[in-house]
């Protein structure tokens, strides 16, 4: 288990539990009661710690390397998944994963950002930072869903769109804007879930949805705390202050009306009980799709556009 900086007291207790278990392996000493007491302390400390996380600490949790990623959710929730590749214009971008499959009995199109789980996969998926061809692939899948009247589920987990020169040369800003436009034009249900880090336009490109769900300890912001601090304070050392000012937590964004539902995580974060988290998000997605099922295409499109116009009006007000 990878422990975060603020989890040191929890790590110390779990280390003691592991030591006791190691000492008694193969021996006759019974210390079950002591282990049970320590485990109860760990559980209590986890609850108290995660009940009062600061925005900066939530940023750490959202970026936890053992947190379930896009492909983990697809593998557990989507059956008969058939991935589709390429944007039919330039290249394949593995930062965006997408395809057709079945979600709890209904055919869907799934699109998500995959960060990778080890060095090799992170490089292969470019750490979840999509290039223009990735967003154009997403547009192709969105249009396919619209053509065949299939609901769309998107899974958001990115630090942002890839900022390299090559991406700018191929029209990164246009690709993001066109993805947002494509989302707004859809006449099928579109449900988006922010499962980790939702970074700026790179996230909203596939999150302009009828229902935006967000995990309890995920973050969603126009800029990273480090980037914001570098601009405002000329130093990334003020990232904690920036995280507070950005109001990037699920709780703040629900209050602001930017997201529709906060999906609760297991005690200690999604990385501690991955299977439980995946099932919980699956239930939330199912609820959202059921809620949208009876709306016709014109109503879906009108309500979706109005929803995001209202968010803009609130910001101007």
Swiss-Prot record:
One of its GO terms (molecular function) is ATP binding. Its main location: cytoplasm. Pathway: Lipid metabolism; malonyl-CoA biosynthesis; malonyl-CoA from acetyl-CoA: step 1/1. Residues 37-291 form the CoA carboxyltransferase C-terminal domain. InterPro entries: Acetyl_CoA_COase_a_su (IPR001095), ClpP/crotonase-like_dom_sf (IPR029045), COA_CT_C (IPR011763). Acetyl-CoA carboxylase is a heterohexamer composed of biotin carboxyl carrier protein (AccB), biotin carboxylase (AccC) and two subunits each of ACCase subunit alpha (AccA) and ACCase subunit beta (AccD). Belongs to the AccA family. Component of the acetyl coenzyme A carboxylase (ACC) complex. First, biotin carboxylase catalyzes the carboxylation of biotin on its carrier protein (BCCP) and then the CO(2) group is transferred by the carboxyltransferase to acetyl-CoA to form malonyl-CoA. This is Acetyl-coenzyme A carboxylase carboxyl transferase subunit alpha. It comes from Rhodospirillum centenum (strain ATCC 51521 / SW).
């Amino acid at each position: 288990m990878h422990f975060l900086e603020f989890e040191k007291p929890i790590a110390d207790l779990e280390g003691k539990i592991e030591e006791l278990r190691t000492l008694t392996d193969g021996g006759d000493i019974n210390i079950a009661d002591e282990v049970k007491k320590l485990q109860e302390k760990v559980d209590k400390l986890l609850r108290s710690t995660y009940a009062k996380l600061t925005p900066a600490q939530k940023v750490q949790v959202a970026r936890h390397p053992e947190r379930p990623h896009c492909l983990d959710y697809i593998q557990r929730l989507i059956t008969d998944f058939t991935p589709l590749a390429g944007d039919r214009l330039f290249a394949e971008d593995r930062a965006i994963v997408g395809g057709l499959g079945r979600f709890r009995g209904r055919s869907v199109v799934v699109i998500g950002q995959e960060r990778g789980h080890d060095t090799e996969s992170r490089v292969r998926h470019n750490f979840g930072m999509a290039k223009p061809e990735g967003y154009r692939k997403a547009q192709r899948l969105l249009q396919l869903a619209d053509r065949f009247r299939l609901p769309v589920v998107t899974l958001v987990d990115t630090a942002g769109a890839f900022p390299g020169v090559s991406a700018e040369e191929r029209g990164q800003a246009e690709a993001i804007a066109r993805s947002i436009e494509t989302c707004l034009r859809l006449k099928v249900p579109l449900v988006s879930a922010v499962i980790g880090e939702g970074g700026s336009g790179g996230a909203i490109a596939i999150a302009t949805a009828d229902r935006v769900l967000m995990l309890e300890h995920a973050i969603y912001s126009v800029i990273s705390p480090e980037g914001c601090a570098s601009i405002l304070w000329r130093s990334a050392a003020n990232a904690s202050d920036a995280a507070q000012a950005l109001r990037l937590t699920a709780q703040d964004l629900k209050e602001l009306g930017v997201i529709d539902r906060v999906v609760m995580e297991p005690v200690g974060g999604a990385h501690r009980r991955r299977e439980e988290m995946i099932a919980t998000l699956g239930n939330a997605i199912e609820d959202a799709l059921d809620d949208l099922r009876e709306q016709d295409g014109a109503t879906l499109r009108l309500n979706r556009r109005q929803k995001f116009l209202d968010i803009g009006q609130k910001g101007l007000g």
